[in-house]
Amino acid sequence: MLTLKKSMLLIFFLGTINFSLCEQERNADEEERRDEPEERDVEVQKRILPFLAGLFSKILGK
């Protein structure tokens, strides 16, 4: 009976840890999804600003 209790306690403990890790990973994924649009905006700005600067310099330079 004592070994059964130890086994059950071990299974419960490992299951709790596994559930906790999965929950943390899921929360991290949700945070990543929330961050993506902002990161995309920054990437687009990085691509567009040099293009516009070059375009304006060509227009104003001529």
UniProtKB/Swiss-Prot annotation:
Signal peptide per UniProt: 1-22
Localization of this protein: Secreted
Keywords (A to Z) from UniProt: Amidation, Amphibian defense peptide, Antimicrobial, Cleavage on pair of basic residues, Secreted, Signal
Domain of life: Eukaryota
One GO CC term, this protein: extracellular region
Propeptide: 23-45, 61
Biological-process GO terms, alphabetical: defense response
Coiled coil: none
Record InterPro entries: Frog_antimicrobial_propeptide
Leucine amide sites (modified residues): 60
Alphabetized Pfam families for the sequence: FSAP_sig_propep
Tissue: Expressed by the skin glands.
Function summary: Antimicrobial peptide.
Similarity section: Belongs to the frog skin active peptide (FSAP) family. Brevinin subfamily.
The protein's name in its UniProt record: Pelophylaxin-4
Organism expressing this protein natively: Pelophylax fukienensis
